[in-house]
A protein has these predicted regions:
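Short coil/turn connectors at secondary-structure junctions
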Residues: 19-23, 30-31, 48-50, 61-65, ...
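Glycine-rich phosphate/diphosphate-binding loop of Rossmann-like nucleotide-binding domains
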Residues: 74-140, 149
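Short acidic, glycine/serine/threonine-rich loops at helix termini
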Residues: 36-41, 79-80, 115-119, 162-165
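Glycine-rich phosphate/nucleotide-binding loop
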Residues: 39-53, 59-63, 67, 146-174
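Short glycine-rich anion-binding loops that position phosphate/pyrophosphate groups of nucleotides
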Residues: 30-32, 110-111, 156-159
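N-terminal glycine-rich phosphate/adenylate-binding segment common to multiple enzyme folds
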Residues: 1-50
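Short beta-strand segments
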Residues: 27-29, 56-57, 66-71, 106-107, ...
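Short, charged beta->alpha transition segments
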Residues: 12-16, 50-58, 90-94
Length: 174
């Protein structure tokens, strides 16, 4: 899409970012185009397999939490989830001043052995990582609570959570 539409706002925005004309770029445009633009125009940080999309989560204690990935990567490897956790913790720490952010994996149970094969494979990687404050698994009921500051999941699940949350808001405001 970026090569077919070089004058689109997304293509122009990423070119400006690459050339240093702007410091940041955000768009409400196509998610796939944003992912491709980020990976090929700006590149990922060395060692990062894939970027993730994050969303803010309102917490019950009026703070904000973070959920990632919410749609950039439907299929993930365990190492990608760990990188999302590290990036999310850095984001929470440096942009929102969360001291030692609590990082969790979204799963169907709090126990270490719970979850799909991806979550089960990622869990020990999170445990062994000294770059984050890993607190274990959280369940769907914890998403808007204050259990974790950063909740990590694959983009398929995260996008479902995001769209479900949007539908709850729409239902409540009617």
């Amino acid at each position: 899409a970026l090569t077919q539409k070089p004058n689109s706002s997304i293509a122009v925005g990423f070119n400006y970012l690459k050339e240093g004309k702007i410091d940041a770029f955000a768009s409400a445009g196509n998610t796939g185009a944003m992912l491709v633009g980020a990976m090929y125009s700006v590149k990922t940080i060395e060692g990062v397999i894939r970027p993730a999309i994050s969303t803010l989560l309102p917490h019950s204690d009026e703070r904000l939490g973070f959920l990632l990935d919410v749609g950039a990567n439907a299929d993930c490897k365990p190492e990608m989830l760990l990188q999302f956790g590290i990036m999310g913790a850095l984001y929470a720490r440096y942009l929102y001043k969360v001291e030692d952010p609590k990082v969790a994996l979204l799963s169907i149970g709090e126990e270490a052995g719970k979850g799909n094969l991806l979550v089960q494979a990622a869990y020990p990687l999170f445990q062994e990582c000294d770059k984050i404050n890993f607190i274990g698994n959280v369940e769907g009921r914890d998403i808007f609570g204050d259990t974790a500051d950063v909740i990590v999941t694959d983009g398929f699940t995260g996008n479902i959570v995001l769209k479900f949350g949007e539908s709850i808001y729409d239902m409540i405001k009617k």
